[in-house]
A protein has these predicted regions:
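Bacterial N-terminal signal peptides that target proteins for export
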Residues: 1-10
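Bacterial N-terminal signal peptides
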Residues: 9-18
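Hydrophobic small-molecule pocket/channel-lining residues, especially in calycin-type beta-barrels
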Residues: 21-162
C-alpha cells in the first residue's frame, strides 16, 4: 500500500515537473521598429513600425510602412488555429485571399500563409515566419514569396521599443 502511494506521488511529481519544463509560447505584443541593418532583400528606403497585440491564439498587427513608392497602414489579425480563412488582399483590387496561421512546432513562433487569387487563379503565395529572440527584444519575420514574376526570400528584423 505504501509503495502504491509512494509511486503515485512520484508520478504526480514527474508530471508536474514536465508541465513546468514545457516551453512557453512567446508573446509578440509590443511596439516594434524595423532595423534595416539586420534585414535583407526588402524594398529600397523601407521604414516600418508595428504595434502587435497578442492574446492567446489571436495576434493583431497594426503597421505603418514607408517605401520609395509611398506610405500605407496595414492592419491584420491572425487566429493561430491552423484553419483557412478568407481575407481581402490590398492588391490587385479584384483579388481574393486565403490565410492560415498557426504556431510553429513547440510554440517557437508563428507561421502565416497567404494565397492571393484573381478570377480563381493563384497569383501569389506568401509565407511569413515570426520568431522572437530569447530576451524578447528582437522580432524576426522571414518572408518566402512566390508570385507570377519570381520567387524570393526576405528578412525583416524589428527591435522592441516598448
Amino acid at each position: 500500500m505504501k509503495s502504491k502511494t509512494l509511486m503515485s506521488g512520484l508520478v504526480l511529481a514527474l508530471l508536474a515537473a514536465s508541465l513546468l519544463a514545457a516551453p512557453q509560447k512567446p508573446s509578440f505584443s509590443g511596439k516594434w521598429k524595423y532595423d534595416k541593418d539586420r534585414s535583407f532583400s526588402n524594398p529600397a528606403g523601407l521604414e516600418q513600425t508595428m504595434t502587435v497585440t497578442h492574446e492567446g491564439d489571436q495576434v493583431k498587427m497594426e503597421a505603418h510602412v514607408k517605401t520609395a513608392r509611398g506610405e500605407q497602414d496595414v492592419n491584420e489579425t491572425y487566429t493561430l488555429d491552423g484553419k483557412e480563412a478568407a481575407f481581402k488582399p490590398a492588391n490587385p483590387p479584384n483579388a481574393t485571399g486565403k490565410r492560415k496561421a498557426s504556431w510553429l512546432p513547440n510554440g517557437r513562433g508563428i507561421l502565416i500563409q497567404d494565397e492571393t487569387s484573381v478570377d480563381g487563379k493563384s497569383v501569389s503565395q506568401v509565407a511569413r515566419k515570426w520568431t522572437l529572440s530569447a530576451d524578447g527584444k528582437t522580432l524576426t519575420v522571414d518572408y518566402f514569396i512566390d508570385d507570377t514574376r519570381m520567387s524570393y526570400e526576405s528578412k525583416r528584423v524589428f527591435s522592441k521599443v516598448e
